[in-house]
Every structure is written in structure tokens, then in C-alpha cells.
Amino acid sequence: VLSSKYYNQDGTLQSSLGETNSLWGDIIHVNGQPWPFLNVEPRLYRLRFLNAAVSRNFALYFVKSGILDARLPFQVIASDAGLLTNPVQSSDMYVATAERYEIVFDFSQYAGQTIDLRNFAKANGIGVDDDYIHTDKVMRFVVSSDPVTDDSRVPDQLRQIDFLEDKTSIDHHFRFHRTNGEWRINGIGFADAENRILAKVPRGTVELWELENSSGGWSHPIHVHLVDFRVVARYGSESTRGVMPYESAGLKDVVWLGRHETVLVEAHYAPWDGVYMFHCHNLIHEDHDMMAAFDVTKLDNFGYNETTDFHDPEDIRWSARPFDSAEFSAKTGIFSEESIREKVNTLALEQPYSELKEVTAALDTYYKTNAKREADCVGEAAGPIPRYRRFQV
């Protein structure tokens, strides 16, 4: 788990209160420890990365200690939504805030040596992160000289994802920008409750979204809730990297918009309906309104009786209620341990979103029926039947 923090002189963490730009941090942490080391055996290791920093993005690479100009190869095997279709060899890896990746690194060639995991300045030019004297360092691996037997290998194929042909038309365009010092999406902030739903997507359809970073010298990792998407394209006045091979080999829910970059993502909006968020995952930008919502709309004549339908954000069962601040401080009343356990048990008994297979099958049947209806009504007025269930995993 990667993070970066500022400390005050007394050793306490510096607060983000009042910060409206970014909180980069000058102390790099891995699993809560500043610049740690790990003793490893000379064999294959599977390493999982989560960027949990408030704002800092990482451009990671491995080198032998003291030899900075010779990056070492590794295999990327998974991203936000799980395994890739196949391992992708790389010598560096961009990990923006909230992104997750898994790699396999082979330490067998470096018995008795030390390997450093390092970070390119300004995320190799993709980001605008402030750099400090040691933010180019992440951690060290100390490789044992004792021989071990390791018969593990990375399969050539990891899983099957049936990617179909690209859509040719963009369904929605979203511009991430700053206006009068405020972070916005298409001119709207999340506090604008009447206007913050920027897209209505029919349940079970596939859409192509264009995400544009037009905020000048900033970058934005964009997180879309509910869905796993495919990164289709990346372009822009300062973009030269395109879609990274390890991005396109799997599905994701966070994509990084570097300076002046635009990215196309394609997602299947299913199986649930309801209102979901999408936002910048730089937590300072997110907390200062760079967030909006999309509504996966109900299907007419769907015909499936969902017992765990949580699409209504105004459902009185989950609405905020007045409380006694004295009970909150004393942890009594509704804040007592017994009351909290009772509430958690009540939520568990609701079994939210437990009908995944049933709802998915019902959506399959719904769209097959509608596709047949359209075929039987050639020449008659009929709405377009969306492409459904693009991603079979």
C-alpha cells in the first residue's frame, strides 16, 4: 500500500484542512512504514500495489541498488478488476491514486544483492506532483544468497475477457477542469444537487465515455463507480504514451488523465440500476467538489422482481436522522456498541445485491427478447437496441 505524508516537527501528521490544491507528501510509505526494506528469497514474488496516497501518483521501476540507468523487467498480471488476459512485461508502471496493479518480479537472478523500487520525478512527466529530496525512493528488497527451489511460473494466459470491436460514437463527454479556483466536471460541482447527474444510462447498455483533462497544469485519476471499463484510447496536446499495454490487457475502474490528456473508456452499465458517482481520486480535488453522478435508469417492462433494490438514494431506511451529540460523545443510545451491532445485522439481513446471477440472467433474457422484437419489426419505428454484455469474464 503506497502513500506519502507530511509530518509536523512534533511527529504528528500534517492535516489537509484548508488545502485546496493537492497534498503531495514528502515521506513515502509502504504499508505504513517510511522507505522500508523487505528480506526476500531468490525466487518469483507476486506483489500487489494499491496507491492509497491523498494526491501523489507514482511511476515505479526496479533497479539494482546504485545502478539507476538500468531498469529491471517484471510482469504485470492484474489491475483494478482482477487478472489481465495475459501477463505484460514492462520496466516501469504508472500507478495513480486509487489504482491497483499486481506484478510478478523474479528475484532469482539477484541472489545476494539488493533491489530498489524507485519513483520517477513528477511521475515521469505525466503528473505535476511536487518532488522532494527522497520522493524518488520507495523501498528496498534484500535478496538472500541462500538457494531455494522454485517451480512456479506465470501462465501465458491468465483469464478470458471477450473484448468486442470498438464503438464508433461517443455517448458522453466529460471535462475535468478548474473554474474560479473550484474543481468542476462540465462546470458542475457535486454540491449542486439539482444538476450533478450528468448522464442517464439505460440499464444493461454499453457506452463510450470521453474523459478530458482541461485543467491546465493538473492531472486527475478518474474513478467510475459500479462498472469495470476498458481503456480504449488516450490522446491530447501533451500526451505521447497512448494506452499502456498493461492498461489495455484488462478491465479497470480508475484511469489517469495526465496533463492535457483525454481518454476514451468503454463500460457495460449493469447489472444494477440506480445513481452512482464518478470523480477525481486526488482526495483534495474530490473533497472540493470534483465529483458528479450518473443514473443507470430503470428498464420498462423488465419484469424481474428485485427484492434487494437499493437504487433510491432517498429511501427513508437509509436517510440521515437527527441525533443527540451527547450520546455520540458518550457512545450511548444509538451509538452504543449494542445498537451499532443491531444496525449492522439489519443491513446484513437485507442481503443487498445478492441476486447477481438472477439479475444478470434476467437482463440477458430482456435484451434477447427486445432484439428479436426489433428484427420482427423491420421498417417500423423502433429505438436502437444497445449492445449488451460486452465483457464476458
Language-model segments: residues:
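Predominantly extracellular/luminal regions of secreted and cell-surface proteins
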Residues: 1-12, 158-183
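Histidine- and aromatic-rich segments of cupredoxin/plastocyanin-like copper-binding domains
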Residues: 2-157
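Active-site pocket scaffolds in enzymes
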Residues: 69-91, 138, 167-388
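Fungal secretory targeting signals
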Residues: 392-393
